[in-house]
Regions:
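HIT superfamily nucleotide-processing domains
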Residues: 1-114
Length: 114
């Protein structure tokens, strides 16, 4: 798999606004936010997309969701709600080919799914 901008952010080769970091994840602010609060929850393990996740990655996916929950509580979005999105490959809207989850919050979001 080719290197992405996220790999460079993880290695601190390019700047980013970091909201949270652990041994296995980094959470950064999106540089083109689609909501008042828009972060990207990125595993440090190289995984191209959700399609390439294996059963061994189940704990990592849980950690991503738990990071979103902790951010929601820390920023006061836990009561009003927030959106978590993963795009998969080009037709699914993925533009950076490293697994990541978008967290959008801070306003009532339109275009929701039932």
């Amino acid at each position: 798999m080719s290197e992405t901008i996220f790999h460079k952010i993880i290695r601190r080769e390019i700047p980013a606004t970091i909201e949270f970091e652990s041994e296995t994840l980094i959470v950064i602010r999106d540089i083109n936010p689609q909501a008042p609060f828009h972060c990207l929850i990125i595993p440090k393990k190289t995984i191209r997309s959700i399609h390439e996740v294996t059963p061994d990655d189940a704990g990592l996916l849980l950690e991503m969701v738990q990071a979103a929950k902790a951010l929601a509580i820390a920023h006061g979005f836990d009561q009003d709600g927030y959106r978590l999105v993963m795009n998969c490959e080009e037709w699914g809207g993925q533009t950076v080919f490293q697994l990541h989850m978008h967290m959008l919050a801070g306003a009532k979001l339109s275009g929701g799914f039932a």
